[in-house]
Swiss-Prot record:
Pathway annotation: Purine metabolism; IMP biosynthesis via de novo pathway; 5-amino-1-(5-phospho-D-ribosyl)imidazole-4-carboxamide from 5-amino-1-(5-phospho-D-ribosyl)imidazole-4-carboxylate: step 1/2
Gene source species: Streptococcus pyogenes serotype M1
SUPFAM superfamilies referenced in this protein's UniProt entry, alphabetically: SAICAR synthase-like
PROSITE patterns in the record: SAICAR_SYNTHETASE_1, SAICAR_SYNTHETASE_2
Record protein name field: Phosphoribosylaminoimidazole-succinocarboxamide synthase
Annotated keywords: ATP-binding, Ligase, Nucleotide-binding, Purine biosynthesis
C-alpha cells in the first residue's frame, strides 16, 4: 500500500496503491449536506458506510453488474479498480421525495408508475445542476449510446436493489449512482452505495438514511447500524 492522497472528498479519501490500476478508498466519519455547507463529525459513520457499501457491491458483482469494487480490507477501507469518473450523478426515483417533491410541488410518498432517471452535472461550483440528455451531449460528457447504457444499467440495478431491500423490510425510495471508465474504456459502476446516497423507508415510513441527519430526526449511526444488520442477515 502507499499513502499518496489522490483525492480528498466530503465522505471519502482516495489513495494510490502499488498497483496503478487499484486505489484504496477510506470512508470518513463526516456527514455533510448542501454540498458541504453543513458538516459534522459522526463517530463510526465511515465504518458503517464502508461495510454497507461493500455488502451491496459484493451482491451486485455476483448478480453480474460490473463494478469497481474489489474487496473490503478494514472496517473503513476498501480496494477499488481505478476509473475515470464520469462527471454525472445518475439519480433514480421510485417514489416522490426530497428535491423532486420540492421541484414539482408534489407530496412525498407518491409511488411513480415508472421509475424516473435523472442526470445531475457533478460540479461543486455550480451546485451540481439538474441537466437533461441534450445538456450531457453539449458538455461532451458521454454520447447517445453511453447515455442509453447509463439509464438502462441504472434501471437494472434498481430492480436488484429494490428486491433485496424489500426482503429486509425496507422501501428503496431513490438513489444516486456514479459510473466511470475503467482501463479498457468500459463503463462500470463506481463510488458507493450506502444510506448516504439513497433513501430508505421502513414499513412505518421512518427514514433509514441520511435524511435522519438532514432533518435532525435522531441518531444517524443507530439507523445505519440497523440497515447494516439487516443486510448481513439477508
Amino acid at each position: 500500500m502507499t499513502n499518496q492522497l489522490i483525492y480528498k472528498g466530503k465522505a471519502k479519501d482516495i489513495y494510490s496503491t502499488k498497483d496503478e490500476n487499484v486505489i484504496r478508498t477510506v470512508y470518513k466519519d463526516q456527514a455533510t449536506m448542501l454540498n458541504g455547507a453543513r458538516k459534522e463529525t459522526i463517530d463510526g459513520k465511515g465504518a458503517l458506510n464502508n461495510q454497507i457499501s461493500s455488502l451491496i457491491f459484493e451482491k451486485l458483482n455476483k448478480a453480474g453488474v460490473v463494478t469497481h469494487y474489489i474487496e473490503q480490507i478494514s472496517k473503513n477501507e476498501q480496494l477499488n479498480k481505478k476509473v475515470d469518473i464520469i462527471p454525472l450523478e445518475v439519480v433514480l426515483r421510485n417514489v416522490t421525495a426530497g428535491s423532486f417533491s420540492k421541484r414539482f410541488g408534489v407530496e412525498e410518498g407518491h409511488v411513480l408508475e415508472t421509475p424516473i432517471v435523472e442526470f445531475y452535472y457533478k460540479n461543486d461550483d455550480l451546485d451540481d445542476p439538474f441537466i437533461n440528455d441534450e445538456h450531457v451531449k453539449f458538455l461532451g460528457i458521454v454520447n447517445d449510446e453511453e447515455i442509453a447504457y447509463l439509464k438502462g444499467e441504472t434501471r437494472r440495478i434498481n430492480e436488484l436493489l429494490k428486491g433485496w431491500f424489500a426482503q429486509i423490510g425496507l422501501n428503496l425510495i431513490d438513489f444516486k449512482l456514479e459510473f466511470g471508465f475503467d482501463q479498457e474504456g468500459t463503463i462500470i459502476l463506481a463510488d458507493e452505495f450506502s444510506p448516504d446516497n439513497c433513501r430508505l423507508w421502513d414499513k412505518n415510513g421512518n427514514h433509514m438514511d441520511k435524511d435522519v441527519f438532514r432533518r435532525d430526526l435522531g441518531n444517524l449511526t443507530d439507523v445505519y447500524q440497523v440497515v447494516l444488520e439487516k443486510l448481513i442477515a439477508l
